[in-house]
Amino acid sequence: MESALPSILTLVIIAEFIIGNLSNGFIVLINYIDWVSKRELSSVDKLLIILAISRIGLIWEILVSWFLALHYLAIFVSGTGLRIMIFSWIVSNHFSLWLATILSIFYLLKIASFSSPAFLYLKWRVNKVILMILLGSLVFLFLNLIQINIHIKDWLDRYEGNTTWNFSMSDFVTFSVSVKFTMTMFSLTPFTVALISFSLLIFSLQKHLQKMQLNYKGHREPRTKVHTNALKIVISFLLLYASFFLCILISWISELYQNTAIYMLCETIGLFYPSSHSFLLILGNPKLRQAFLLVAAKVWAKR
């Protein structure tokens, strides 16, 4: 069963890769068509485009690193190639996490209702808040790249001094653990911010939903259904985001203890987030949902 596990998970990875490219590509395409026709895009549409592009990059990086790890090819990559591969992975992962976090803050400020003066101040300046957070996240990216570059330089110096297979393998595992630990630590900040934002948004939606149900008791108020669906989507978003962060954390621990099966399983589950969450974004966005249903109807009609 253990020998069959890599083959099974590889098939799952490829399926997630295809789904992720289709869903994120769909978001980019529909918003691009809308931008060409209207000559303008809303703030949320711009966020969705950049998020979808970063996720496409992340999905490709995960697929490449999967096959490199599967066949132990990463240790044969040159210093420049290794830097390009790891830096691309870090950049795509950074923007995927931070843009999802920024999207959660955007939804919180746009949808939630709180009487706090601080919240109202941020709500009135939502575009500036989003821009400042995005620019601030670049500081984390810069520090992350510096730290990772130090790990790469240290490993290359040791690798050039001893090229035996056993040394290369054991030292590369140590290097990989250091890289994964650094990524986990830098992922903690956007995850914490997103967790707080989603929790506040869920609390606000739940509170508002209860009020609406009391006011329209015995009636099927359309707005109640809209808020219920929004609540379900937000909770699903939170669960997927949390599972992705936990996969990063557990994959680091499993690599530390050299548990290959758990590591591979976490990588597979981790790819489910950037692949599947885009479908939630499509279903939660009226324009994207309408376009998706139209495409689905045309495809179904041709069968």
Swiss-Prot record:
Glycans are attached at residues 162, 166. The keyword Glycoprotein applies. It is a multi-pass membrane protein. Pfam families: TAS2R (PF05296). GO terms for molecular function: bitter taste receptor activity; G protein-coupled receptor activity. Keywords: G-protein coupled receptor, Glycoprotein, Membrane, Receptor, Sensory transduction, Taste, Transducer, Transmembrane, Transmembrane helix. Belongs to the G-protein coupled receptor T2R family. Most taste cells may be activated by a limited number of bitter compounds; individual taste cells can discriminate among bitter stimuli. This is Taste receptor type 2 member 13. It comes from Pongo pygmaeus (Bornean orangutan).
